[in-house]
Amino acid sequence: MKPLILALGVVFAVGSPSAQTPAWPPSPGHAQVPIWPGVVPDAQPVEGPEESGTVVDRVGSKKLVAGRPWAYVGRVSQPTMTVYSPEGSNTGAAVVVFPGGGYNILAIDLEGTEVCDWLTSKGITCVLLKYRVPCVKSGPYLDCRTALEDAQRTVGLVRLQAAPWHIDPHKIGVLGFSAGGHMAAAIS
């Protein structure tokens, strides 16, 4: 009887493996690097673990953009950056990309990895930021101080790592979509 109770306790404590969505992994050959050492500053509580998946509409059909479904990441509490280096010639320029998603999720492929693939094909290093979402709602607007902190920190880290990453520190730009565009304007 005790082994059965123990087994049920483990199942209820951990949950079903199929019920847990794995966190977003970058493409092979790329690694997510935490942007904050140790404890993340101004950490906000996030309900549940980080999630990733394909965006669906209200009836459960995959939402398509240009005929393709798109992936999202949500409930991000540990922000990371993923560096995509140019495979051919390197211009020395770098762009930090902030995906959009209304400060609730991140459109990680459509406004992230696909953009990085295009930038690297042009000889530009791309740094994809997976910033903290969702943001805290404050009145009619979202208070996204934590996402802005992540953006500022990432640009600073890119400048710090410019030499080893073969980047000219005077050629670092930012590019954002939707909420990410708001962040790009805020730190410019």
Where are these regions (language model features)?
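Bacterial N-terminal signal peptides
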Residues: 5-15
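Aromatic- and Gly/Pro-rich amphipathic surface segment
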Residues: 38-86, 93
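Active-site glycine-rich loops that stabilize anionic/oxyanionic intermediates
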Residues: 39, 99-104
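Short beta-strand element of the alpha/beta-hydrolase
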Residues: 91-100
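Active-site loop->helix "elbow" adjoining a glycine-rich segment at hydrolase catalytic centers
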Residues: 100, 178-181
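Short amphipathic alpha-helix adjacent to the substrate-entry channel of hydrolases
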Residues: 108-128
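Gly/Ser-rich "nucleophile elbow"/oxyanion-hole loop immediately N-terminal to the catalytic nucleophile
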Residues: 142-146, 157-174, 178
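Short glycine-enriched nucleophile-adjacent loop
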Residues: 159, 181-188
